[in-house]
Amino acid sequence: MAEPSLVSGGEEPEERVIEAALRPKNLHDFVGQHRVRKQLALVLEASKMRGRSADHVLMSGPPGLGKTTLAMIIAAEMNAPLRISSGPAIQHAGDLAAILSSLSEGEVLFLDEIHRMSRPAEEMLYMAMEDFRVDIVVGKGAGATAIPLELPPFTLVGATTRAGLLPGPLRDRFGFTGHLEFYSVAELELVLRRSAGLLDLKVNSAGFTEIAGRSRGTPRIANRLLRRVRDWALVHGIEQIDARSASAALDMYEVDERGLDRLDRSVLEALITKFNGGPVGLSTLAIAVGEEPETVETVAEPFLVREGLLGRTPRGRIAMASAWTHLGYAVPAGVFGQETLALYGEDENHAESVDTVG
């Protein structure tokens, strides 16, 4: 079973109170995502000028980039109450009807992981978003009747890490869609500077750069690493965090200079030392590192692929040339590079089921 990871983009339950204190409260304080911020500001300002609820908003992108924060900012900018729920919590149309029927005029409803809602609830949401009305079915079989229920105008903010799983009719009902992208190191430094100020931490520029460089382009991870470095500095009696102390702290937590953790390095190490760089099937690779295939596929692989360290081909997973270099191995002649992916033809769906060692 995978250990909790410092570099997971997901939010841990114990982090929620701290994260809430560090969240920006308005678009001006929100760092990064310049394109989405600019577009969203225009949508909200126009809505306020018209005196109407804002259009429904869909935020997509990997975990930890600010989708929940933006939902809270939308409610604050519109001076409206915020109702928070999630797709997994809405498994029946009745669950959604109960939420919708209790909304007040202008209220913002935030549905996290909206792609995980049940199909009956999705179909009810279509009418609610478009006509601000739902039909409540009373009775069963031939005697069932639909009672229309009028809803006050509201703004739905949906968040998803897998926009491709949303049905087209649902996507089309959002007036604004914003895709959040990973942050640059410079943007993460700004996030860390703001958080350090709120936490009353003394960190120099080199310290911010060191932490930002290991944060996988994700503000949530950056803030998490900052708190771990703070703990390390407190125990070691260090008043100002610099690059050396930040590096020592994160090395202790096994987060390396590129943001790889123990599981990431184990996957690459197994590919190189046990399978000569691959290709190897997912199930075999998971056995080699002592984890479940789903853990390797969903926790480790996305970042490794994005960093160009691991490739997925129809024949299985391969270690790219940069993976050999990163782990300190000499790159053998003819080892896999980007041209090899082109030769094999990347096929993620097939690669997920293939279990070939050679």
Swiss-Prot record:
Transmembrane segments: none
Protein localization: Cytoplasm
Keywords per UniProt: ATP-binding, Cytoplasm, DNA damage, DNA recombination, DNA repair, DNA-binding, Hydrolase, Nucleotide-binding
Positions annotated to bind DNA: R312, R317
Main localization of the protein described in the UniProt heading: cytoplasm
Function noted in UniProt: The RuvA-RuvB-RuvC complex processes Holliday junction (HJ) DNA during genetic recombination and DNA repair, while the RuvA-RuvB complex plays an important role in the rescue of blocked DNA replication forks via replication fork reversal (RFR). RuvA specifically binds to HJ cruciform DNA, conferring on it an open structure. The RuvB hexamer acts as an ATP-dependent pump, pulling dsDNA into and through the RuvAB complex. RuvB forms 2 homohexamers on either side of HJ DNA bound by 1 or 2 RuvA tetramers; 4 subunits per hexamer contact DNA at a time.
Entry's free-text remark on domains: Has 3 domains, the large (RuvB-L) and small ATPase (RuvB-S) domains and the C-terminal head (RuvB-H) domain. The head domain binds DNA, while the ATPase domains jointly bind ATP, ADP or are empty depending on the state of the subunit in the translocation cycle. During a single DNA translocation step the structure of each domain remains the same, but their relative positions change.
Protein name: Holliday junction branch migration complex subunit RuvB
Record organism: Paenarthrobacter aurescens (strain TC1)
